[in-house]
Amino acid sequence: MATWTKKDFDAAGVTEYPAGPALDQLRRNFGGSVVLALDVSGSMEGERIEKAVRGCRRFICEAVEANYSVGLILCDHGISGSVPVDYDPSAAYCLLAQAAIAGGTNIVPCLKLAHRMLLDARASDMVLAVFGDGDLGDPFEASRVAAKLTADGIRILTCGLGQSSAESLAIISTETSTTRVAETSTIADSIADMARGLRFLSR
């Protein structure tokens, strides 16, 4: 007599070729999503924005290679432009190519948009990475809104141009061991280096 019982096991189909609709679900379950926010306020003019765009492209490339879907926000005192989280970085690269400086500084609209974008992505690791050369705008409101992101399991990485900016942005960072500081000569490298904060990045 058989001593085993037949059971049904439901799981995402992983043997389809070409990949079927289960692929996106598997990526969400075992991968991550990151929104990269770039300050495009007026003080980012000249070589600052040029180097920042190069660094953002490198960050996005590393994130995609690590199985992260990527969204992008260009922010000043509001939202200059954005693309939703996706595993295809083409739209993010296209927006970066159009990045133009204007306006002042207020991180709050960026935080709110990134919050919605990341919750929609529903990944196992949700990250907001921010680069700027100024402050938060309204630090009290920024801290209040950032707390909502962290309550939903979203990690926040920040990098500022110069010590003053870095310390200001670090108020909303969930990293406790370091304050990421960029110099004008290292903007691209510093932005790209934030990818080290992605949990699933292989080094």
Where are these regions (language model features)?
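Acidic, polar low-complexity linker/tail segments
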Residues: 1-35, 42-48, 203
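VWA/integrin I-like adhesion module and closely mimicked acidic/polar interface patches used
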Residues: 6-8, 99-104, 134-182, 192
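Well-ordered alpha-helical segments embedded in enzymatic catalytic cores
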Residues: 21, 55, 109-116, 141, ...
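Von Willebrand factor
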Residues: 26-84, 110-111, 127-131, 159
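Switch/connector loops and helix/strand junctions flanking conserved nucleotide-binding motifs
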Residues: 45, 78-84, 137-140, 166-169, ...
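Arginine/glycine-rich "motif VI" loop of SF2 helicases in the C-terminal RecA-like domain
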Residues: 62-65, 121, 147-154
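Short beta-strand-loop
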Residues: 68-98, 113, 117-119, 167-175
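C-terminal "exit" segments of structured domains
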Residues: 180-203
